[in-house]
């Protein structure tokens, strides 16, 4: 039997079972749980390699994959493992062992490599599902490219451009604006979903927006987050199977957090920036993260907690919410939202799996290109501060890695009823995939695929003789010029009303579903329900009498060494 050294094997095919990989410059170590590629039968493209006619490429005709990613190290809530990934017509059709069953053992019938199959060599690369950002203020279309090149492939939120309403609230108000945004975004290489304005006690006004194509409703305090609009929006949501997102009442004008909880009345709801610096009942909105019917999210400016977090928030808040620093009441409003104690608790609650989702709050107290970056910075900070999770050991951080990747992939997908389409690497799902070199994981992807087509990549000088000479910058690829490799997420009611046809939309529209029959217990690796207490004088956060807090830090992983400053 021919043998190969471990070093040579890893250089040729990437890591295998029980090998460990460090994620960029963090202290997070993953361990490969399983390798499906079958030793001695691995497939690889290139000079002197085996993906050739009659070898690992079948000579037969058949309905074979359009694209196979070979020897991919998959990091997903479903596991951390190595496999080949097959894509056909934009969807994942197989995960396992690819090749030619005429001469190779163990080949998955859905992963037969044929003449029509192209190859992406994923040896030594990490593959994740595309990120999902559910807190987008659609202030500028330039956000889309910024998010895409960070590894985000789905954007859900509201807005129409830099209006005062959009700058402050994630609402696309009314049928006219919803139709306009569905049309305006159909040629971008990104999945979109738009939230209608939920701030109305008029059920017909809410219903009109859902029929127009909104995938959900957003309630925001700047429009008045009263008990009546909360109840009305949730009634319509239950009737039409859409999600409601909420930014609650910082000033407690219409009631306190207990009144909002009462108005919600046990119905499922997605709470934005549940810590409160981004907005919400002062000082105790964070209590809502502990309820089973609440799907709690953070926005990224407060994550992770650093020495600069508090200082930068005041100016951000004044701009985003149309406040004036010459007006005393406006300054006091801003100050009430920024509490070091609850911000310090947020990191720990994420690490415990109490907070479930990470998002951006793009250009409205959030950074659209840093959802993934800050998720992994937070995971690393928490490992350094709190040590290994009890579910992990001293050798790897697989449980923590699954917990944190779920926060921006499968959990936001579940929350908004799109998990049957996107959010994980599973057969039958849309092939929105991101490829990373381990040394750049979480910071700078190597390739971004939408619907199985390459839409973005780090690429070198176009006039160079090879694709790698500097300057290496992100560029749109050919797949970015299509519209069939991206989705619009809309309501079923809008499909029943033939809205895509009436608007002559070019891209595929699919319905959100199962938004109302879920709870926090359905969220992956982040399903903890706790009784959270907030001291009204000191703002300290406790669970079962234990102080929940974390330290602000002076430095982070995935920071300056990766960026030109």
From Swiss-Prot:
* Matches recorded under Pfam families: Amidohydro_1 (PF01979), Urease_alpha (PF00449)
Q: Which cofactor does it need?
A: Ni cation
Q: Which Gene3D superfamilies match?
A: Metal-dependent hydrolases, Urease, subunit C, domain 1
**Which superkingdom does the taxonomy of this entry point to?**
Bacteria
Modification(s) after translation:
Carboxylation allows a single lysine to coordinate two nickel ions.
User: Which residues are annotated as active site?
Assistant: 321
Q: Which residues form the Urease domain?
A: 130-565
The cofactor binding remark recorded in the entry reads: Binds 2 nickel ions per subunit.
Q: Which residues bind substrate?
A: 220
Q: Which residues bind Ni(2+) 2?
A: 218, 247, 273
Q: Write out the entry's keywords from A to Z.
A: Cytoplasm, Hydrolase, Metal-binding, Nickel
Family named by the database record:
Belongs to the metallo-dependent hydrolases superfamily. Urease alpha subunit family.
Name of the protein described by the UniProt record: Urease subunit beta
What organism does the UniProt record list as the source?
Campylobacter lari
Q: What is the lineage of its organism?
A: Bacteria, Pseudomonadati, Campylobacterota, Epsilonproteobacteria, Campylobacterales
Gene name per UniProt: ureB
